[in-house]
Amino acid sequence: MDLVNHLTDRLLFAIPKKGRLYSKSVSILNGADITFHRSQRLDIALSTSLPVALVFLPAADIPTFVGEGKCDLGITGVDQVRESNVDVDLAIDLQFGNCKLQVQVPVNGEYKKPEQLIGKTIVTSFVKLAEKYFADLEGTTVEKMTTRIKFVSGSVEASCALGIGDAIVDLVESGETMRAAGLVDIATVLSTSAYLIESKNPKSDKSLIATIKSRIEGVMTAQRFVSCIYNAPEDKLPELLKVTPGRRAPTISKIDDEGWVAVSSMIERKTKGVVLDELKRLGASDIMVFEISNCRV
């Protein structure tokens, strides 16, 4: 990391170096036109489009680097932020990496409720979150609780089968790994997703930070919305605009056809099928949907 000390003219942006968050983080950077080339031998890459240096770190370490002001921005999961117990701004929900940190027990075992695990051994890589959860469950402090929390760095789901613990606290996304290990969830400690996090005391120019955040917000908006354009009879316009109110307001333009107007509006991607059906039912015609590659909101 000695190279970092020579990058005082660049904003340091911490990115997960591998795992479930890496590829989607890179996709968001590409969408925000933060271009870079990463050498396989280095965990630092210089952006060719902005004065930014990307620092590739384990997702669990990113909250600490951002919280201590070593990096101005980072991408990581809320679970890692809470586990690190650092003070950072959760700037933008990036809408990926959605999963739950859950208490899991053997499916055919004796434990059905988390209260039954008081005084037992819990295996996890999220020690602080597990300690807080079970201390609260016992109604006491971490120092005084009877439940034992044991740390392992990986393959947490194998712990019960190997006799290391009575239960585990681990992340669940689809649940396939949990079921394959013969486990079932009985409680949720935390729901999490990936966020852009920001240092409380950034060292870089605030306008550059604002530019990066604006670009990423644009990417997120483009992923969430599509552009809907259609022709509408003027006498049906009030009803049609209830279906497509837009983010702020729709754009309405006169066309060379008496009694008709053209309407352009942003609609949520997940509702486009229902919206198009309703527009057609209400009398709209020439209804089209276009992808939004990027935007500023």
From Swiss-Prot:
Where does the UniProt entry say this protein principally localizes? cytoplasm
Q: Which GO terms describe its biological process?
A: L-histidine biosynthetic process
The species this protein belongs to is Saccharomyces cerevisiae (strain ATCC 204508 / S288c) (Baker's yeast)
- What protein is this chain from? ATP phosphoribosyltransferase
Pathway membership, UniProt? Amino-acid biosynthesis; L-histidine biosynthesis; L-histidine from 5-phospho-alpha-D-ribose 1-diphosphate: step 1/9
* In-chain residues carrying the UniProt-annotated modification N-acetylmethionine: 1
Mind telling me which Gene3D superfamilies this protein's record contains?
3.30.70.120, Periplasmic binding protein-like II
Q: Do you know which InterPro entries this protein is assigned to?
A: ATP-PRT_HisG_long (IPR020621), ATP_PRibTrfase_cat (IPR013820), ATP_PRibTrfase_CS (IPR018198), ATP_PRibTrfase_HisG (IPR001348), HisG_C (IPR013115), N-reg_PII-like_a/b (IPR011322), N-reg_PII/ATP_PRibTrfase_C (IPR015867)
Would you name any one GO CC term?
Answer: cytoplasm
Which NCBIfam families does this one have? hisG, HisG_C-term
Instruction: Extract the signal peptide range.
Output: none
Pfam families, per database record:
HisG, HisG_C
Q: What does this protein do?
A: Catalyzes the condensation of ATP and 5-phosphoribose 1-diphosphate to form N'-(5'-phosphoribosyl)-ATP (PR-ATP). Has a crucial role in the pathway because the rate of histidine biosynthesis seems to be controlled primarily by regulation of the enzymatic activity.
Domain of life, per lineage: Eukaryota
Record's keyword terms, sorted:
Acetylation, Amino-acid biosynthesis, ATP-binding, Cytoplasm, Glycosyltransferase, Histidine biosynthesis, Nucleotide-binding, Transferase
A GO molecular function annotation here is:
ATP binding
EC annotation from Swiss-Prot or TrEMBL: 2.4.2.17
The text of the family note is: Belongs to the ATP phosphoribosyltransferase family.
The protein's matches in SUPFAM superfamilies, at most eight in alphabetical order, are given as:
GlnB-like (SSF54913), Periplasmic binding protein-like II (SSF53850)
Catalytic activity, as annotated? 1-(5-phospho-beta-D-ribosyl)-ATP + diphosphate = 5-phospho-alpha-D-ribose 1-diphosphate + ATP
